[in-house]
């Protein structure tokens, strides 16, 4: 356990642990490969999910920990969908590979509504934890609604990415901006830098996938 908690360096007076650096590196590699339309992103994603599970377990962040099996399931679904498209979904450039597609506007409206409702309901429950419910057992979340909105957006972005929807990168951009806000408010230094790298990759991938979409339109 102590091996993973080795302090590699300090940034802005905050220690950066080995587990933090590894998680950031594998996370960035996963989205980088996904943005380049590489199926290898799923294999790296499995390692990333395992690292997050271990990190959240160590830090007693059980709300985040229980999401990792869900992320694992989405990753498995994505690997299958990208490799086993229906004939009408097959890429014109690569046989046997899922093409990039887009959500319709009605579908976007439904997803946005679901994200807002789920984030509000989950945020309300989290706002009660440590303040009115289980006081002394759970630390109060200073930004419950923003935190829950980010979590719901992450699961939404992962699902859309697994289905190879261009819109996933829009969701990821919202996630990156929200995460950047959360990390800065928490006084962190290393994670905002990582979030900026995610943001740059998200913008690049948005245009990369749009070009792929146009080729198959």
What spans do the regions from the language model cover?
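Polytopic alpha-helical membrane-helix bundles and their juxtamembrane interface segments
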Residues: 1-37, 73, 82-89, 97-217
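Membrane-interface helix-loop junction between the first two transmembrane segments
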Residues: 33-47
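Hydrophobic/aromatic-rich structural module bridging two neighboring secondary-structure elements via a short loop
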Residues: 45-100
């Amino acid at each position: 356990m102590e091996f993973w908690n080795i302090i590699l360096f300090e940034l802005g007076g905050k220690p950066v642990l080995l587990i933090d650096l590894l998680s950031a590196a594998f996370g960035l590699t996963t989205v980088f490969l996904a943005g380049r339309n590489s199926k290898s992103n799923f294999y790296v994603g499995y390692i990333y999910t395992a690292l997050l599970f271990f990190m959240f377990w160590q830090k007693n962040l059980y709300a985040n920990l229980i999401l990792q099996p869900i992320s694992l399931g989405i990753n498995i679904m994505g690997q299958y969908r990208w490799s086993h498209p229906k004939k009408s979904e097959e890429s014109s450039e690569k046989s046997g590979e899922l093409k990039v597609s887009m959500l319709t506007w009605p579908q976007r409206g439904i997803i946005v509504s679901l994200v807002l409702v789920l984030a509000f309901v989950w945020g309300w429950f989290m706002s009660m934890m440590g303040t009115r419910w289980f006081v002394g057992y759970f630390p109060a979340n200073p930004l419950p609604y923003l935190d829950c909105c980010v979590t719901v957006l992450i699961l939404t972005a992962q699902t859309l990415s697994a289905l190879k929807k261009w819109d996933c990168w829009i969701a990821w951009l919202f996630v990156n901006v929200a995460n950047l806000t959360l990390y800065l408010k928490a006084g962190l230094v290393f994670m905002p830098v990582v979030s900026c790298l995610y943001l740059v990759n998200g913008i690049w991938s948005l245009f990369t996938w749009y070009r792929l979409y146009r080729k198959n339109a």
